């Protein structure tokens, strides 16, 4: 038998041992690799899980992500593939949600911050808080406010109130002195705010006699507000029920305050005229109230014309003036009468100066209008006022203006709103004694200069139609 080459026993043992060790080494390397892979996988799962756990439940609800995709019932982690899928889905929906909410990515957010900073450095623009406007026609008696108020009363989508603060003046009394004006202004302002919010019930505390079951026959000048005399506010007429201030063109039952408040809320806009708001600064809380979008139109008129009109309309209050005019002697007018006239002019002037200074809270919310400009161009001024208020002017209002400003004769009564406006506004010049005009010019000089009313040097200039007592003014009246 042939003998082959054989390795020594020691070598064979060594080779066999090496093979066995190699197998164990390979197995050990495999185990280490698997262990490292599992550890990495666990770390990834842990990070994803932590991310998911940190997301508020509200966001999951907001973007309709199923919570079951995030955590299992037993709070254990799902497989990596399921978690990756859930996390990707959630991330996508969060992105969509952020876009819907106006939240931009970091770079876009930084751009927005720069844009906001740029806007803050720009002058404030006219307020555009919302579609509903709250227009206040701020005036004094005998300035033509009833006539100008009709520009808003005749528009069907505006709820208009005529002098609602009249009831407060008749009911609330204040101590005489300097606090009187401030105290009354605060009450007027607070009532005004509630009225703009269509809380007409606030008037029930001031109407005399007190309304019963929200019904009253004593709403001041109800007939001057179309909104209070149209359906459904105009309820069936009740026989033998006397209504002091009744509707003009139809017969209605007592005013139902609840129905009036509901009608106010249904209208697109709200407007009212008030001759008892004297200090513009008291309206700042209303201008800053987020529930309101206030527009103030201050109506002024030549103080000489105002006094001439008041002496006719309120003759009983001006007996002292008439006696002074009729007195051929040298006795002067009582100083307290002149001081009262001067105080009225100054309060009007100070409010106008505040509005024209354009403080931030009033910017875009104030307009100064001269009655003389309205009388000379009523349709043009109506369009300007509506543009300022942010309300479209309807043909209905334009037709009313055309018909009621070109009448052959002024309407009857001292409160008539039917006028030949282009001729009417200067009638006072031919009936006022020059010495009365001199008193007004001396007491109201600063206000007259601000509003562009020229002084009459003598009686001839006062009655000369070819001599204008009105300066032409530009568009600076709107701020």
Swiss-Prot record:
Sulfotransferase that utilizes 3'-phospho-5'-adenylyl sulfate (PAPS) as sulfonate donor to catalyze the transfer of sulfate to position 6 of the N-acetylgalactosamine (GalNAc) residue of chondroitin. Chondroitin sulfate constitutes the predominant proteoglycan present in cartilage and is distributed on the surfaces of many cells and extracellular matrices. Catalyzes with a lower efficiency the sulfation of Gal residues of keratan sulfate, another glycosaminoglycan. Can also catalyze the sulfation of the Gal residues in sialyl N-acetyllactosamine (sialyl LacNAc) oligosaccharides. The keyword ATP-binding does not apply. Residues 108-128 are annotated as: Disordered. It is linked to Spondyloepiphyseal dysplasia with congenital joint dislocations: A bone dysplasia clinically characterized by dislocation of the knees and/or hips at birth, clubfoot, elbow joint dysplasia with subluxation and limited extension, short stature, and progressive kyphosis developing in late childhood. The disorder is usually evident at birth, with short stature and multiple joint dislocations or subluxations that dominate the neonatal clinical and radiographic picture. GO terms for cellular component: Golgi membrane. Residues 1-20 are cytoplasmic. It comes from the Eukaryota. This is Carbohydrate sulfotransferase 3. Its main location: Golgi. Glycans are attached at residues 63, 74, 96, 256, 420, 464. It is a single-pass type II membrane protein. 3'-phosphoadenylyl sulfate binds at residues 141-147, 301-309. Belongs to the sulfotransferase 1 family. Gal/GlcNAc/GalNAc subfamily.
């Amino acid at each position: 038998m042939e003998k082959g080459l054989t390795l020594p026993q020691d070598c064979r043992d060594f080779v066999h041992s090496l093979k066995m060790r190699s197998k164990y080494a390979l197995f050990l390397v495999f185990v280490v690799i698997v262990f490292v892979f599992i550890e990495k996988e666990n770390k990834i799962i842990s990070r994803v899980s932590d991310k998911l756990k940190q997301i508020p439940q509200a966001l999951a609800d907001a973007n309709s992500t199923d919570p079951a995709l995030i955590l299992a019932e037993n709070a254990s982690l799902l497989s990596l593939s399921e978690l990756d899928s859930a996390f990707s889905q959630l991330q996508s929906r969060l992105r969509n949600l952020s876009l819907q909410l106006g939240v931009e990515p970091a770079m876009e957010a930084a751009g927005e911050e720069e844009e906001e900073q740029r806007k803050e450095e720009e002058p404030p623009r006219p307020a555009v808080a919302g579609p509903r406007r709250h227009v206040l026609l701020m005036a004094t008696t005998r300035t033509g406010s009833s006539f100008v108020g009709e520009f808003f009363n005749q528009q069907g989508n505006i709820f208009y109130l005529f002098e609602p603060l009249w009831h407060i003046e008749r009911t609330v009394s204040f101590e005489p002195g300097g606090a009187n004006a401030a105290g009354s202004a605060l009450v007027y302002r607070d009532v005004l705010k509630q009225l703009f919010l269509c809380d007409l019930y606030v008037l029930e505390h001031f109407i005399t006699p007190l309304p019963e079951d929200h019904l009253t026959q004593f709403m001041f000048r109800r007939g001057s507000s179309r909104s209070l005399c149209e359906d459904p506010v105009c309820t069936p007429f009740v026989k033998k029920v006397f209504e002091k201030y009744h509707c003009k063109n139809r017969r209605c039952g007592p005013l139902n305050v609840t129905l009036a408040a509901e009608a106010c809320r249904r209208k697109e806009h709200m407007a009212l005229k008030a001759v008892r708001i004297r200090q513009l600064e008291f309206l700042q809380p209303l201008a800053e109230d987020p529930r309101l979008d206030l527009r103030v139109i201050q109506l002024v008129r030549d103080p000489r014309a105002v006094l001439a009109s008041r002496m006719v309309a309120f003759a009983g209050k001006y007996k002292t003036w008439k006696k002074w005019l009729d007195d051929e002697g040298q006795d002067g007018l009582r100083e307290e009468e002149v001081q009262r006239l001067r105080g009225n002019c100054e309060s009007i002037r100070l409010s106008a100066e505040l509005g024209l200074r354009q403080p931030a809270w009033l910017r875009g919310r104030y307009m100064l209008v001269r009655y003389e400009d309205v009388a000379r161009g009523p349709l043009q001024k109506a369009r300007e006022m509506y543009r300022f208020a942010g309300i479209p002017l309807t043909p209905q209002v334009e037709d009313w203006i055309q018909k009621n400003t070109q009448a052959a004769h002024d309407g009857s009564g001292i409160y008539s709103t039917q006028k030949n406006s282009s001729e009417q506004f200067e009638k006072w010049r031919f009936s006022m004694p020059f010495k009365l005009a001199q008193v007004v010019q001396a007491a109201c000089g600063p206000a007259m200069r601000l509003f562009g009313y020229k002084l009459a040097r003598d009686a001839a200039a006062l009655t000369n139609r070819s001599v204008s007592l009105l300066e032409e003014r530009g568009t600076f009246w709107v701020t």
